């Protein structure tokens, strides 16, 4: 029995299928960076330990084996700065699996920018410096970041959606802080109401134009031809065919002014609103449209009534008022009163004129002055022929 055990120990049992394979020299095949330092252990053919393989898969121990000289060849792992920049570094970047959302199940690379986050319940990352082959320190990120403490909206708003929120529009330092004022049309309605109240007051002040006397229609002469009419302007007869055309043209001219009047009225209303807006800027002593909008929307009624009175007086001063209708006799007497003191002053200060003054003219031939102009009255009773005969005699 002892001899059999010794034979078994010297020659282990080999399965009939497993045959010893000749040793092959390792070929210089390119390896990835993750296969660096991984050395295959010698495996006895025919004997497989599944428990050992399962444990190795569960807990992979980091191998701290020194690299062989063949690892520094070109094509294998190189610690030159070119390869560290242009190739992925599995030792320096780790990936975490995001759970809880289907659209974020892809892995997110962890970088050192996550260190700036200061959310409640977030543990700081452990950054351990390690030296490169050249002696330069390399920052290695360890995966100790917990996503359970982060709520979903804060994670999305701070980590993923890193765009800064702009509260003030770009380009206008004194922008409209209340954007509802510019979008709403309520302030425009208030301004239109205020302008209408001002215009109603000004219409009452404006003098009514004198009603033009309607000229009596000219009596047309009886038609000499059937359907023909005589025109006093041209002195010709207008045939009946052209009359229909002229009537249509007149009707068209009557229709068009109504549409034009509507456009003119709309433009006048817009001009009135602009005028009221400009006067409000002067009354409120501001050049900000936002301030005027706020005043139109939220000003008390007493303040608006006070501003309305100021607007009415300002608009009334802008309206050109006609001269008061003075009777002609009063105007004539007033001009004569102004003329008499001027004549007395000239007579007092010019004594030499008394000697050379011509004899006074009769009242009938005495010129009358309107300002500095002389007005000579021609008597209609005397004919010019009679005057010439008297002068000849």
Swiss-Prot record:
Residues 20-34, 205-227, 380-393 have a biased composition (Basic and acidic residues). Residues 173-185 have a biased composition (Polar residues). GO terms for biological process: spermatid differentiation. InterPro entries: TBATA-like. Keywords: Cytoplasm, Developmental protein, Differentiation, Nucleus, Spermatogenesis. Residues 1-39, 168-188, 202-264, 340-393 are annotated as: Disordered. Induction: Up-regulated in aged mice (4 months of age or older). GO terms for cellular component: cytosol; nucleus. Expressed in the subcapsular region of the thymus and lymph node (at protein level). Highly expressed in thymic cortical stromal cells and testis. Lower levels found in brain cortex, hippocampus, kidney, cerebellum, skeletal muscle, epididymis and ovary. No expression detected in other lymphoid organs including bone marrow and spleen. Isoform 1 and isoform 2 are expressed predominantly in testis. Isoform 3, isoform 4 and isoform 5 are expressed predominantly in thymus although isoform 3 is also expressed in testis. Isoform 1 and isoform 2 may play a role in spermatid differentiation. Isoform 1 and isoform 2 regulate thymus function by modulating stromal cell proliferation via interference with the NEDD8 pathway. PANTHER family: PROTEIN TBATA, THYMUS, BRAIN AND TESTES-ASSOCIATED. Interacts with KIF17. Interacts with UBA3. Belongs to the TBATA family. This is Protein TBATA.
């Amino acid at each position: 029995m002892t001899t059999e055990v010794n034979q078994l120990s010297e020659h282990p049992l080999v399965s009939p299928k497993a045959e010893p394979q000749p040793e092959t020299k390792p070929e210089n095949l390119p390896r990835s960076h993750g296969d660096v330092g991984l050395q295959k252990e010698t495996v006895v053919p025919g004997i497989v330990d599944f428990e050992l393989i399962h444990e190795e898969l569960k807990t992979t121990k980091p191998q701290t084996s020194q690299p062989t000289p063949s690892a520094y060849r070109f094509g294998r792992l190189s610690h030159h700065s070119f390869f560290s920049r242009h190739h992925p570094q599995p030792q320096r970047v780790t990936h975490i699996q995001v759970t809880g959302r289907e659209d974020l199940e892809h892995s997110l690379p962890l970088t050192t920018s996550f260190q700036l986050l200061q959310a409640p319940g977030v543990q700081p990352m452990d950054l351990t410096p390690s030296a490169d082959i050249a002696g330069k320190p390399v920052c290695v990120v360890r995966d100790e970041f917990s996503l359970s403490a982060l709520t979903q909206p804060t994670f999305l708003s701070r980590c993923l959606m890193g765009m800064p929120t702009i509260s003030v529009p770009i380009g206008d330092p004194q922008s409209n802080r209340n954007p509802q004022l510019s979008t709403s049309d309520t302030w425009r309605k208030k301004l239109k109401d205020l302008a209408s109240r001002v215009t109603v007051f000004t219409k009452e002040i404006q003098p009514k134009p004198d009603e033009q006397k309607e000229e009596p229609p000219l009596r047309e002469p009886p038609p000499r031809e059937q359907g023909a009419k005589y025109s006093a302007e041209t002195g010709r007869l207008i045939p009946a065919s052209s009359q229909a055309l002229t009537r249509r043209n007149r009707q068209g001219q009557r229709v068009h002014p109504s549409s034009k009047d509507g456009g003119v009225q709309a433009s006048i209303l817009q001009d009135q609103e602009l005028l009221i807006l400009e006067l409000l800027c002067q009354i409120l002593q501001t050049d900000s449209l936002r301030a005027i909008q706020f005043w139109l929307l939220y000003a008390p009624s007493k303040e608006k009534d006070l501003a309305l009175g100021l607007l009415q007086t300002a608009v009334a001063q802008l309206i050109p008022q006609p001269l008061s209708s003075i009777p002609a006799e009063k105007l004539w007497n007033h001009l004569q009163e102004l003329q008499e003191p001027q004549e007395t002053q000239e007579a007092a200060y010019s004594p030499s004129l008394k000697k050379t003054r011509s004899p006074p003219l009769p009242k009938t031939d005495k010129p009358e002055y309107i300002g500095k102009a002389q007005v000579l009255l021609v008597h209609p009773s005397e004919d010019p022929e009679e005057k010439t005969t008297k002068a000849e005699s």
